[in-house]
Amino acid sequence: MPKIFRSLYVQVIIAIVLGILVGALFPKFGEALKPLGDIFVKLIKMVIAPIIFATVVSGVAHMRDTRKVGRVGGKALIYFEVVSTLALIIGMVVMNVLRPGAGMNVDPATLDTAGLTKYTEAAGEMTVWDHILKIIPDTLVSAFTGGELLPVLLVALLFGFALMRLGKLGDQILYGIDALNQVVFVILGFIMRLAPIGAFGAMAFTVGKYGLKSLTSLGYLMGSFYLTCLLFIFVVLGLIARAAGFSIFKLIRYIREELLIVLGTSSSESALPRLMMKLEHAGAEKSVVGLVVPTGYSFNLDGTSIYLTMAALFIAQATNTPLGLGEQLSLLAVLLLTSKGAAGVTGSGFITLAATLGAVGHVPVAGMALILGIDRFMSEARALTNFIGNAVATLVVARSENAVDMNRLTRALNGEDLPTTEPDVASEERGEGREIDSSRPVT
């Protein structure tokens, strides 16, 4: 096999193209391939919890200073709030300028809302206190079985703080956790070999079920959304990255394989473990990566923020629902809360939109039926923007803490120092992997 075809990057591109062709030419067969994408995403989710746990525990325990943990977490949350609020405002401004829904004159009473039931029910079942209580698991073990990131993060933080107090015994336990992390990353390498198959199945299902026509229907909204995401990435995040001393273009090139996985699965969560690995390799301290990335997947979803304001205003415009400045500010205030509860998984943005419209009351929830058919295609842009946003956030916070080796970052982004833990690299077969952190002695 030519060397170029051994690259995961090339394999995923080929898989996505083949998936589109199969879905377009054989729709029923394409729909039947959905389990391929589901299996890959489930396999990735299987290792996310142990990776986050081991990384956060190791990072917190090695910091030794609880004030530094609080400082890093505080900086991350402030960054998340400022940038995601900016994303919400940008989406709102674009919709007020372009007004893609104006002139549709849709009567909400005539819309078929049968397909919305599962989303509105899921949104209506959760209150603010329910979201808070979800962070606290019933048991230490249940944090790893519920499929949520925040409970794992909470347990990992507590575990890391506890190890800081245990002294030599904590050192021994920490060595074992670092070894566990290495084992899980080897497992991740096995799973990533299936990435092209997962991307193929997910893309074939999407095109097969919704058809290529759904790519062009309501195209003005889709075009506006994709354009807004691109502007946000290359202008807003680009300026932030430049201020922090790195190039957004080089960063995107550095994480291109992960971006293709996100594109194929429509889930930014599917590439979370590899993002953490690559940011560490690029020179960001493990402790900062372990805190910022998992937290960002709940609090720093820039693409979802843009989508929520644009979708809400599109529905209002299409149904001739007048929204003055006061109503739009009210919508923005609600979105500042609801957007923080959206996970980086497929469909979560639509559920969050249902919760937002239900809470605001001005915009008819039935109008969501207008975008149900194209939501799956907008999901790709949401996931990609979320993913890039979290990569930028981690490096910015690390830079503010002097917790990133800028020379190493420059070499990595220039392609001079690439990770050697790709799933198709021979070193994996020789048993080489991530180095166990043994900076704390085992006695």
Curated annotation (Swiss-Prot):
Alphabetical GO biological process terms: L-aspartate transmembrane transport
Gene3D superfamilies: Sodium:dicarboxylate symporter
Disulphide linkage map: none
Stored InterPro entries: C4_dicarb_transport (IPR023954), Na-dicarboxylate_symporter (IPR001991), Na-dicarboxylate_symporter_CS (IPR018107), Na:dicarbo_symporter_sf (IPR036458)
Cell compartments where the protein resides: Cell membrane
Stretches with biased composition (Basic and acidic residues): 427-443
Entry annotated with the keyword Transport: yes
Predominant location category: membrane
Signal peptide positions (record): none
Transmembrane segments: 7-26, 46-63, 76-98, 140-162, 183-205, 218-240, 350-372
UniProt entry tagged with the keyword rRNA-binding: no
MF terms in GO: fumarate transmembrane transporter activity; malate:proton symporter activity; succinate transmembrane transporter activity
Protein origin, superkingdom: Bacteria
Assigned GO CC terms: plasma membrane
PANTHER family per record: AEROBIC C4-DICARBOXYLATE TRANSPORT PROTEIN, PROTON/GLUTAMATE-ASPARTATE SYMPORTER
Function of the molecule: Responsible for the transport of dicarboxylates such as succinate, fumarate, and malate across the membrane.
Family, as annotated: Belongs to the dicarboxylate/amino acid:cation symporter (DAACS) (TC 2.A.23) family.
Entry protein name: C4-dicarboxylate transport protein
Source organism of this protein record: Deinococcus radiodurans (strain ATCC 13939 / DSM 20539 / JCM 16871 / CCUG 27074 / LMG 4051 / NBRC 15346 / NCIMB 9279 / VKM B-1422 / R1)
